[in-house]
Amino acid sequence: MRVAPEFYELLRNRINISDVVRQKVALTRKSGNYVGLCPFHQEKTPSFTVSDSKRFFYCFGCKAAGDVIKFTSNISGLSYNESAIKLATDYGIEIPKLTAKQKEFYEESDEILNILELANKFFRTQLTPEILNYLHERGITEETVKEFSIGFAPKNNKFEKFFHDKNIDIIKLGKAGLIGKRENGEIYNLFSNRITIPIRNIYNKIVGFGGRVLGEGLPKYLNSPETTVFQKSETLYGEHKAISSSYKKNHSILVEGYFDVIALHQAGFSEAVASLGTSVTENHLHKLWRAGDEIILCLDGDNAGIKASIRTINLALPLINSEKKISFIRLPNGLDPDDAVNKNGADFFAKLIDKRISLSEMIWHIEYSGKSFKTAEEKANLEKNLKDYCSKISDSNLKASYYRFFKEQIWQNLVTKQKKATTKNSNLAPIISSHGYSELEMLEHAFCALLVKFPIILEEKDIRDFILNLNFNNKSLEEFRNWYLNEIIDNNVEASEITAIVEKTSFFDIFLLLSKTDNLFLDISFNKNNIRLDLLWQWLHKKYYLINLQQEYSITINSTDNHDFEKVLLYKKEILKIANELQVLNESFINHTIT
């Protein structure tokens, strides 16, 4: 009984794969998934994983992988189609009958798939030593040539004769996307004089071909036209091999070309796929996200690659959230993924993966790097572009995080640099305390001391968000802040256990400094016997605001000969107001007055 492919998707959505697997395998819950002993090979330690969210199983031992239908097929020995029917019967799901039009459609699809399989067998027989030598020069081994069924379409009439002998006419070859028609009406083999690379769908069926011209002809690369079985917006080259690897690694690598995919697979990066001569689509992204939470784009670093990155960013922004992510590998100038792995090796490419940047970082790189922001108009345009990106994000929490990230980047790369330049030009030296830190760095120490001595203060969301998003001048303190929040505070580590944990890290010296009974940063007493956290926080927050206000005041005074006196007066008024408020707090709380 023939069923539509849409019915397979219905089964995947309606039936939890863990329910089916549990009938054959004892499963244990682990990190949101399930693990158990693989039913397809002998093992003593569980390496078989099942994910309901990804609707997928994978064995790290024997590499068995697939969906709920594939699992049933592997267990029962039935075909994929027969397994789908069995599952529908077992779970009481109605099997929709095909209409006459659907039957005609699937009969035509089957015929096209058969023709494409025959074409690939023919192309494989046409490989010559010259072609193999060309492939070897590109770093492709004979084993890889076989694995990817790479072939060759000759110029002569062997192709036409091959199908004529099998009683397959021109009309059928046209429906399969194998022939073209010249302006003079002449019919020809579409892939004539090209290396052929079969394109397979998720079910490992050949649905089309890619062709690379032998020599310098144009176009260099050619894809099959869209047919009944081949839609470029749905298909990714290499997906039949990559999906199981993407599930295992929880990410996929999206590149531009066939040979990029082939080179990466040969080097061990079997999670690589490529879009087929077209822009990345929503369907592509959703297909990859079903297999792994992160899609790593690795596009050429030229102008075309940057434009492709921008298109993909704009497409992805409404779709991403804290779980479904996009990141980018930035290739060295002049390299594509094929070159990167063949010329520099797998270890080099693995390091590029490790150094990948987030989508937000890529946006900042595109909008900021190599550009001038000397004028108000240039800065305003930067802010507008960044806000436009943020506005496309549907996830409200992520949108807020992006706004904060870009605000921090603007502060670090524009405001802070301008402040430093102004300070240098006006001979204004930073205020240094007896501890050897600037006033701002002492405040940073004080904020970190709060984490260590009074973590209860973080129960106030505004305070936690402020400390979490604070951009430290002292990067060692910033690293300590991030580590302490993630590893100690968020894990609710008992106070008696903290020292033993920190002692094993590189942060121990900082921790000891911050843990002193009477911390002397800014001459503030952190002694718990007389502490008032509300007043302490007010003092620190106002002091931080005052220092930044004074720096902005200095910029205004020194940035031009013609001062904006109204603005200067406003700064003076605000500085005096905050200084007076701090004085009141000093008298109420601080042991040693600061002036």
Swiss-Prot record:
Which Gene3D superfamilies does the protein's record reference? 3.40.1360.10, DNA primase, catalytic core, N-terminal domain, Zinc finger, CHC2-type domain
SUPFAM superfamilies in the cross-refs:
DNA primase core (SSF56731), Zinc beta-ribbon (SSF57783)
Query: Does Zinc-finger show up as a keyword for this record?
Result: yes
Q: Which sequence ranges does the entry mark as zinc finger (CHC2-type)?
A: 38-62
Q: What molecular function terms (GO) are annotated for this protein?
A: DNA binding; DNA-directed RNA polymerase activity; zinc ion binding
Whether NAD counts among this entry's keywords is: no
Catalytic reaction annotation = ssDNA + n NTP = ssDNA/pppN(pN)n-1 hybrid + (n-1) diphosphate
Write out the domain note: Contains an N-terminal zinc-binding domain, a central core domain that contains the primase activity, and a C-terminal DnaB-binding domain.
Q: Give the similarity note.
A: Belongs to the DnaG primase family.
Q: Which PANTHER family match?
A: DNA PRIMASE
Q: Tell me how this protein assembles.
A: Monomer. Interacts with DnaB.
* Protein's UniProt name: DNA primase
The organism named in the record is: Rickettsia felis (strain ATCC VR-1525 / URRWXCal2)
Lineage per the UniProt record: Bacteria, Pseudomonadati, Pseudomonadota, Alphaproteobacteria, Rickettsiales
